[in-house]
From Swiss-Prot:
Source organism of the structure: Escherichia phage T7 (Bacteriophage T7)
Catalytic activity annotation: Exonucleolytic cleavage in the 5'- to 3'-direction to yield nucleoside 5'-phosphates
Protein role: Plays an essential role in phage DNA replication by participating in the removal of DNA-linked RNA primers. Participates also in T7 DNA packaging, host DNA degradation and phage genetic recombination.
First-tier enzyme category under EC: hydrolase
Name used for this protein in its record: Exonuclease
GO molecular function: DNA binding; double-stranded DNA 5'-3' DNA exonuclease activity; RNA-DNA hybrid ribonuclease activity
EC number: 3.1.11.3
């Protein structure tokens, strides 16, 4: 089976009705398998080469996939998707050219692309890569609406915490081994958390001064606004000073109004904050038209 894009996968799955589909992070699985199969060798005095045993890497990859496939009885025999990242990234093209610019270049394992070419010919997996999308986006599009791809339920399998932002699926978070059941509400919460917190490794800063305290804010949101007063005593008597004061939101004020207010305190406009949210967003089914290859940027 050749490498597919989302449109081809959609057409191939038309009429299917599987109980579930396993949507795996192909980038991560392949990199881990190949890295574990690398070794140094010296073929002549004082000259060393980095090598990769592709047969060993292939076995590690197959064992990893098998271990996840058999994690639960209900997953056995489910179709498997391996998602991969395109060389062009829509976030750089449409949102911010500095996206992931802070990341140090990581050298691919030896023979990486040849290994992928062989993997893409395997019949037992659906290998999918979509123009301009990261593998994460491919996974998000499929998992947020598995019925469009011939399955009643999707399970995301990855070590990346950002998949907490994908709704209507289960997420096997390989870092912890926990299986998270995700709803629209929980996924939206995590997306706003990432928007506020930011992710320096991905090149977006969020709202300055928050970090992990974004969790407390989202659970107990408030409005912060500038209040100007005149000093009535002391050496600066008569001078105006401005302080940012917290208050409870009014009934007509939304969570987004609260987020805008803490952004304003940090010197950000609403569009600045939206830009953070767009970079934090893993695409969902209704945010990408895989027929026309059109991306619908997130807005609150």
């Amino acid at each position: 089976m050749a490498l597919l894009d989302l449109k081809q996968f959609y057409e191939l799955r038309e009429g299917c009705d599987d109980k579930g589909i396993l949507v795996m992070d192909g980038d991560w699985l392949v990199f881990q398998a190949m890295s574990a199969a690398e070794f140094d060798a010296s073929w002549e005095e004082e000259i060393w080469h980095r090598c990769c045993d592709h047969a060993k890497a292939r076995q590690i990859l197959e064992d990893s996939i098998k271990s996840y496939e058999t994690r639960k009885k209900a997953w056995a025999g489910a179709p498997i998707v391996l998602a991969f990242t395109d060389s062009v990234n829509w976030r750089k093209e449409l949102v911010d050219p500095n996206y992931k610019a802070n990341r140090k270049a990581v050298k691919k394992p030896v023979g990486y692309f040849e290994f992928l070419d062989a993997l893409f010919e395997r019949e037992e997996f659906y290998c999918i890569r979509e123009p301009m999308l990261e593998g994460d986006d491919v996974m998000g599009v499929i998992a947020s609406n598995p019925s469009a791809f011939g399955a009643r339920k999707a399970v995301i399998i990855s070590c990346d915490k950002d998949f907490k932002t994908i709704p209507n699926c289960d997420f096997l978070w390989c870092t912890t081994g926990n299986i998270l059941t995700q709803t629209e509400e929980s996924a939206d919460w995590w997306h706003l958390f990432q928007t506020i917190k930011g992710d320096i490794t991905d090149g977006y800063s969020g709202i300055a001064g928050w970090g992990d305290t974004a969790e407390d804010f989202l659970n107990n949101p408030f409005i912060t606004e500038p209040k100007t007063s005149v000093l009535k005593s002391g050496k600066n008597k008569g001078q105006e000073v401005t302080k940012w004061v917290k208050r409870d939101p009014e009934p007509h004020e939304t969570l987004w109004d609260c987020i805008k207010s803490i952004g304003a305190k940090a010197g950000m406009t609403e569009e600045d904050i939206i830009k953070q949210g767009q970079m934090a967003r893993i695409l969902r089914f209704n945010e990408y038209n895989f027929i026309d290859k059109e991306i619908y940027l997130w807005r609150p």
